[in-house]
């Protein structure tokens, strides 16, 4: 069955790629350095109506630009943007257009990220996207309609990210689907920047498995980084770290020897040592994997939950910023107002913001 699915999808990718492979797109000037994710607005939220409209406004964009960010990553979900029968949701698209207009006004670039599909959630047990041809076509049709709405925006200001954190049983299943998706977008927008992430949550360990279209200079390879997990997801309610009841440290050994007896199931992971050199070795895996395509890389998500020990969190952010700058990696911290946010309520986390922006 797996071989049949891959063979079928491969035919589609090969066929659809012919339309642009002979005449590769010219390089545009979309460049990003330091961004922030606008989470829980058009993605991962049940809020609608006036409350949704008030969650992210022109004042937020002005504030973000004033801090010194140069872009936002804007997650959108299929269920917010489209009805179950595939019709566009006018209110959601109006909000998206508002955000893009505000970003243009305040000179912020935007990565529009199709975050969650009805047929794919990165933490769901069942993901029909990888086994159902109709689900795949629905995914491509989402992008045709998104492109139809957004193609009027400058290719130097707005980029598309195909999908957030794919989790297929086999990386080649995702490779076939994502390359077909790129081909669909290329039929409509030959020179738009497209971000592609690798299988299994866009991990730094799987970028080597990502297959990227050749001779397309407007592709960016995207990865996410949440290591060490005991720190970044400290006591996260949705994670196995929810019962972590000892401090976690950075840099150095994550859990002190004196606390090991109380660390429970986290003792083994807690013995790991993390520092800037370890993180850089992980980044180099991404850099090396991207070199064969001569493409830039982008860290679309990274961050530490607000519940983590403050001083350790700040040291981690400073090291991340040092490495991003050292290797010329664009990035967007997760997130703006959520559990990892640079705002707590309306209160700016100034020390955290300064560490992220290198101030």
Write out the residue ranges for each language-model feature.
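Glycine-rich, proline-tolerant flexible connector loops at the mouths of alpha/beta enzymes
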Residues: 76-90
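N-terminal carbohydrate-binding accessory modules
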Residues: 20-71, 86, 289, 355
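Bacterial N-terminal signal peptides
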Residues: 7-16
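An active-site-proximal structural segment forming one wall of the substrate-binding cleft
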Residues: 52-55, 59-71, 87-116, 123-159, ...
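Active-site region of glycoside hydrolase catalytic domains
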Residues: 133-273, 280-304, 326-329
């Amino acid at each position: 069955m797996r071989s049949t699915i891959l063979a079928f999808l491969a035919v589609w990718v090969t066929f659809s790629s012919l339309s642009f492979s002979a005449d590769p797109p010219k390089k545009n000037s979309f460049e990003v350095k330091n961004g922030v994710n606008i989470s829980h607005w058009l993605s991962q939220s049940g809020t609608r109506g006036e409350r949704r409209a008030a969650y992210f406004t022109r004042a937020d964009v002005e504030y973000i630009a004033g801090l010194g960010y140069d872009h936002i990553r804007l997650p959108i979900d299929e269920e917010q943007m489209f009805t179950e029968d595939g019709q566009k949701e006018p209110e959601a698209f109006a909000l998206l257009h508002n955000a893009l207009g505000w970003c243009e006004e305040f000179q912020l670039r935007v990565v529009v990220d199709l975050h969650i599909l009805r047929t794919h959630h990165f933490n769901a047990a069942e993901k029909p996207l990888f086994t159902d041809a109709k689900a795949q076509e629905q995914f491509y049709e989402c992008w045709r309609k998104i492109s139809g709405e957004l193609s009027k925006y400058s290719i130097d200001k707005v980029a598309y990210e195909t999908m957030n954190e794919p989790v297929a049983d086999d990386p080649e299943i995702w490779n076939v689907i994502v390359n077909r998706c790129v081909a669909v977008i290329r039929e409509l927008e030959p020179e738009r920047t497209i971000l592609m992430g690798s299988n299994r949550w866009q991990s730094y360990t799987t970028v080597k498995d990502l297959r990227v279209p050749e001779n397309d200079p407007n592709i960016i390879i995207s990865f996410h980084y949440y290591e060490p997990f005991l720190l970044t997801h400290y006591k996260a309610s949705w994670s196995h770290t929810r019962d972590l009841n000892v401090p976690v440290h950075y840099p150095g050994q994550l859990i002190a020897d004196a606390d090991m007896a109380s660390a429970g199931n986290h003792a083994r992971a807690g013995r790991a040592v993390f520092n800037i050199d370890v993180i850089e070795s992980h980044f180099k895996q991404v850099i090396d994997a991207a070199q064969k395509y001569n493409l830039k890389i982008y860290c679309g998500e990274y961050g530490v939950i607000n519940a983590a020990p403050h001083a350790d969190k700040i040291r981690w952010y400073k090291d991340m910023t040092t490495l991003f700058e050292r290797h010329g990696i664009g990035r967007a911290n997760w997130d703006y107002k959520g559990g990892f946010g640079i705002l707590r309520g309306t209160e700016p986390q100034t020390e955290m913001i300064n560490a992220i922006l290198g101030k």
